[in-house]
Amino acid sequence: MFEDIPVDVSPMHEGERIRSANMFVELAGPKSIGAELVQVKDEVEDGKVEVKGPEIDEMEQGQVYPFAINVEVAGSELEEELESVIERRLHELCNYVKGFMHLNQRDQIWCRVSTEAKDAGFRLEHLGKALSVLFREEFPIIESIAVTLMTDEAAVQEFLETAREKYETRDSRARELSDEDVDVFYGCLMCQSFAPTHVCIVTPDRTALCGAINWFDCRAAYKMDPDGPIFEIEKGEVLDPERGEYANVNAAVEENSQGTTDRVYLHSVFGYPHTSCGCFEAVAFYIPELDGIGIVNRDFRGETPLGIPFSAMAGQCSGGKQVEGFSGLSLEYMRSPKFLQADGGYHRVIWMPRELKESVLEFIPEDVRDKIATEEDATSIKDLRRFLRDNEHPVLERAAVEETEPEEEEVEEAYPEETPIPEGVPVMAAPEMTLPAAGGFRIVLKNAKIYAEKVIIKRK
């Protein structure tokens, strides 16, 4: 079946991580552009695989290239409603190919090819052939399939614009339905190869964290493959309509998370927030100093007012963990009328990147639009506090915000000998961070990067 492909193709490789040291090239991701799209057509040249742009053996090691995947399928039983369902399986099936890593979805894809795969003779043409076979196996209703892979920047840019128009068409349809209109929700387990205890709950008002699967997509997927990774959940008893807690959802999450999580609030970052996988489009995070919520999206390269970027924050709550005060979410959920409704919705949001704010501006209530800060208004807690006060943000009504900053006692700086930090060790970077202490003093770390397995503070 895969005899002419120089690397192994098997589900056993799903979950493989390709680190920088083992990487030949990176495709799309945060340093470039990319997209993926599946389109149902009336006719398709079956088995056609085309590569537009440099092939793997024409690329320079260590470089980053634009990348797009366009899959066209045809079949008498195929419907346009199934496009996003098939498309989301690209994540899973690409990872079947040894030496090829696929992360995220839609226009957020991030791929890598290992040096080992390149040395074995792997090319993008082989990826296209593998996808053709795998999709036919996964979806027997596909009668013909063609795959186009792009690494030419102009071709990827043009395709990206087309793909985004398609994404918006799908998303806008789902906005017409609400949780109260249906009796069934859905669960999705597609990310469990990377986040074994994560169970994604999809409702009309809460799109999957990846942003690629909405309630209609799940319904179509379940009808087509009732034994697949997407399953039905009878809505059943509503335990808390404001937080979005349902008895059957709790039971489904407990069963499919290996008992790790037994309660979930669909519309709150507090108490029992929805678990996070790793391919979420944004993170909502609590800012305790101001009793407000910040949101940072994957595309934002700067630091949040907490002093850490998206990547560090994502590492704190991904992998299927349930971390109070943090929750991965999709950008489409930010357009939902139930967006974090238990926490106050946008009236509790105090910071987000400018581009993200502009993309959801029409869904932010008018009375608070100009009161939510961006990186252009505030880059620290101090700046943010001042902005909120000057603009009379409603979050100030929840708790008093300090008018003055407490005095800080300068501590003599020490520079311990640097020790190389192995890859994968948790890192926290912060321009200013206060550590809890006792005895009438406190410790303030400024412009700190901390690599530590243990911190011991002793008073002589």
UniProtKB/Swiss-Prot annotation:
Stretches for region Disordered: 402-422
Keyword Iron-sulfur set for record: yes
InterPro entries: ACS_CODH_B_C, CO_DH/Ac-CoA_synth_bsu, CO_DH/Ac-CoA_synth_bsu_3_sf, CO_DH/Ac-CoA_synth_bsu_arc, Prismane-like_sf
Cofactor(s) named in the record: [Ni-Fe-S] cluster
Enzyme kind, highest EC tier: transferase
Job of this protein: Part of a complex that catalyzes the reversible cleavage of acetyl-CoA, allowing autotrophic growth from CO(2). The alpha-epsilon complex generates CO from CO(2), while the beta subunit (this protein) combines the CO with CoA and a methyl group to form acetyl-CoA. The methyl group, which is incorporated into acetyl-CoA, is transferred to the beta subunit by a corrinoid iron-sulfur protein (the gamma-delta complex).
Name under which the protein is recorded: Acetyl-CoA decarbonylase/synthase complex subunit beta
